[in-house]
Amino acid sequence: MASRSMRLLLLLSCLAKTGVLGDIIMRPSCAPGWFYHKSNCYGYFRKLRNWSDAELECQSYGNGAHLASILSLKEASTIAEYISGYQRSQPIWIGLHDPQKRQQWQWIDGAMYLYRSWSGKSMGGNKHCAEMSSNNNFLTWSSNECNKRQHFLCKYRP
């Protein structure tokens, strides 16, 4: 019995030193159907909503959820890989918008707008809401008319 307890203690000690235990114990859980990456939970919804309704639906999930801000290439790549497991052709609303309609883009969740991934046909006209474009496997963004109905991505920090 003492030997079994000692082995368990040794195993837990090894896991703690490698960081594996921290991932197992400290990792918060996301809502069912959402996925976890780097301290955030993401929900991909294949419902058709305009940008404003998509944002309202994200907020309805609580936990401070909004349409997703994408702040790095690593985050963009993880999201793109996840979405590609469901579909490869429909654009997806994200939380980037131009509320004053002056090409002054900002994230709806208040995150700093530093990382940019606009496609060549990114902005112009009456297009003041951003989408992840299915061209280039969801790694680039395009602007679109905010009243267009399409899939959307929500994000919150658990």
Curated annotation (Swiss-Prot):
| Disulfide-bond pairs as recorded | 30-41, 58-154, 129-146
A Gene Ontology molecular function term of the record: heparin binding
Asked whether the keyword Magnesium is assigned, the reply is: no
Localisation: Secreted
Mind telling me which Pfam families this protein's record contains? Lectin_C
UniProt xrefs under InterPro entries: C-type_lectin-like, C-type_lectin-like/link_sf, C-type_lectin/snaclec_domain, C-type_lectin_CS, CTDL_fold
Q: Taking every annotated instance into account, which residue ranges of this chain make up the domain C-type lectin?
A: 37-155
Mind telling me which GO cellular component terms the entry cites?
cytoplasm; extracellular region
What induces it, per record? Up-regulated by mucosal injury from active Crohn's disease or ulcerative colitis. Up-regulated in colorectal tumors. Up-regulated in epithelial cells at regenerating margins of peptic ulcers in the stomach and duodenum.
**Which processes are annotated in GO (biological process)?**
response to bacterium
Record's signal peptide: 1-22
**Alphabetical UniProt keywords:** Disulfide bond, Glycoprotein, Lectin, Secreted, Signal
Q: Which SMART domains match?
A: CLECT
**According to the lineage, what is the superkingdom?**
Eukaryota
Glycosylated at which positions? 50
Organ and tissue specificity: Highly expressed in the gastrointestinal tract including the duodenum, jejunum, ileum, ileocecum, appendix, descending colon, pancreas and small intestine. Weakly expressed in normal colon and stomach. Strongly expressed in most colorectal tumors than in normal colon. Preferentially expressed in mucinous tumors and in some cases neuro-endocrine tumors. Expressed in mucus-secreting cells and enterocyte-like cells. In small intestine expressed at the basal perinuclear zone of goblet cells.
Concerning PROSITE patterns, the annotation shows:
C_TYPE_LECTIN_1, C_TYPE_LECTIN_2
Q: Which residues bind a carbohydrate?
A: 98-103, 135-137
Any idea what job this protein has? Calcium-independent lectin displaying mannose-binding specificity and able to maintain carbohydrate recognition activity in an acidic environment. May be involved in inflammatory and metaplastic responses of the gastrointestinal epithelium.
Q: What is this protein called?
A: Regenerating islet-derived protein 4
